[in-house]
Design a protein with these regions (language model features):
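ATP-dependent carboxylate activation and anion-phosphoryl transfer catalytic cores
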Residues: 1-228
Length: 228
């Protein structure tokens, strides 16, 4: 069973920054094609449990890169458009339970976008460990924040810089983008620098709004804006 695709093209140094589903780069036929390819591939190799197959897409063709035999950071956007709790299903299947649905049971509704909120300088991407002096996460319909951060929390310098995931969903991509703009405005993190301003900048660009971006877009945008 496949749960649709995710577009992870907004990235820097091969590190994902923003993810969304469904991909604005695919039409319905291409979406159905890659979904069926993945479903058949998993069936052929006899794989059981959650997994993610990654592809490059260029000139209307898919190029397989790798398979990650686990959940991905961006799994909440898939949960948002399918209504399936992937973490729960992973645990059930690992315990020996059968998958509780078939491909025909899987439906896709709306659009979802995730921003990875990192404790980094939004211009240089230098890590910014330190103490959180103020923390206010956005909320409301179609807004989800996954994080363990709180006011007074000290971010250590030893690990990955991601401190939160902001996930928004809406009936359409435009609705999700409107919700994302509001959520980013409401998101307050003080005491350290974060990539919130970068996300606000990205989603205000015409190329992103139109869905006309690729894996090189962010680095090209940063080079144009900051000369780096």
């Amino acid at each position: 069973v496949h749960l649709g695709e995710r577009d992870c093209s907004i990235q820097r140094n091969n590190q994902k920054v923003i993810e969304e589903t469904p991909s604005p780069a695919l039409n319905r036929q291409q979406r159905e094609e890659i979904g069926e390819i993945v479903r058949k591939a998993i069936e052929k190799i006899g794989y059981t449990n959650a997994g993610t197959l990654e592809f490059l897409f260029e000139d209307g063709r898919f190029y397989f890169m790798e398979m990650n035999t686990r959940l991905q950071v961006e799994h909440p956007i898939t949960e948002a458009v399918t209504g399936i709790d992937i973490v729960r299903e992973q645990i059930r299947v690992a315990s020996g339970a059968a998958l509780g649905y078939t491909q025909d049971d899987v439906t896709f509704s709306g659009h979802a976008i995730e921003c990875r909120i990192n404790a980094e300088d939004p211009e240089t991407f230098a890590p910014c460990p330190g103490k959180i002096t103020e923390w206010h996460a956005p909320g409301g319909l179609g807004v989800r924040v996954d994080s363990e951060i709180y006011s007074g929390y000290s971010i250590p310098p030893f690990y990955d810089s991601m401190i939160a995931k902001l996930i928004v969903s809406g009936k359409t991509r435009n609705a999700a983008l409107m919700r994302l703009r509001r959520a980013l405005e409401e998101f307050v993190i003080e005491g350290v620098k974060t990539t919130i301003p970068l996300h606000q900048d990205i989603i205000s660009q015409a190329e992103f709004i139109d869905g006309q971006y690729n894996i090189h877009w962010l680095e090209q945008f940063m080079a144009r804006k900051y000369g780096k």
